[in-house]
UniProtKB/Swiss-Prot annotation:
One of its GO terms (cellular component) is early endosome. CDD domains: enoyl_red. Keywords: Endosome, NADP, Oxidoreductase. It comes from Bos taurus. PANTHER family: QUINONE OXIDOREDUCTASE-LIKE PROTEIN 1. Pfam families: ADH_N. This is Quinone oxidoreductase-like protein 1.
Amino acid sequence: MKGLYFQQSSTNEEITFVFQERENLPVTEDNYVKLQVKACALSQINTKLLAEMKMEKEFFPVGREVAGIVLDVGSKVSFFQPDDEVVGILPLDSEDPGLCEAVRVHEHYLVHKPEKVTWTEAAGTIRDGLRVYTALHYLSHLSPGKSVLIMDGASALGTIAIQLAHHRGAKVISTACSLEDKQFLERFRPPIARVIDVSNGKAHVAESCLEETGGLGVDIVLDAGVRLYSKDDEPAEKLQLLPHKHDIITLLGVGGHWVTTEENLQLDPPDSHCLFLKGAAVAFLNDEVWNLSNVQQGKYLCILKDVMEKLSTGVFRPQLDEPIPLYEAKVTMEVVQKNQGRKKQVVQF
């Protein structure tokens, strides 16, 4: 039985992906479930977070968003039985890679998969669904009538975010990074209030948002990264398409929420003062927090169930690439790790 792992070189950030033979899984006991994996979605690995949590080891398992069939359950398992169809996210410290035929996982990381939902849809939506719920419900309190700016709305995460915001009755503004993205966003139903094309570098996001909201500013911003410095000082890998932090602060309305994915965000005293005057809040989107405390377990499972329900009723319509076989996972994962893919990649077994 082969599984995909990654190895990080000691000198630099470069990581290599390798297939390794695995021993058969031990007997399933206590609260653990043995799962036959039917699909596993690929996401970028945050090596920095793993290092900070002292979770580095020579070979680290790859693939966490899994959907599959329960083969066997431990004696204390109460939620599942053999032949149940389930979906979930393996914890950061999982010893088993999701990119493998079978995995062992604690029952508290899984929920039932609705019959209508395909394996690839389930695995491909569960993590982005969780991130969007975290951003729009728990960090910014989305409600009907609010205005929401979703940066890079044509990305896998952005698409789900727009769909949830529309479902909740919010007014959505989004940015497009290319002509294809712009055309994709303009075809959205219900329609997006305004699509701002930032691909040519001429559009002013802040001006467009203030114009669209009658000068009031938006209630919620979900960014896809921001520039912290002027264009001359910014490192080359930071896309010039990203907005500057001052633009985001300018377009925020009174009492607004800025949910950021920029883990190294730095705010100077004038920035903080401007946020203070608006009574606005900055929140950091880190979906790993749900499993860092057992107190959150019930809420976490409710979110996963709700994501699957939204998928089965057609509220969520994910942007998935064509499913690929396991033997192509190594090459595809290298592309995903460099953040070069637009649609969500799913390995189908």
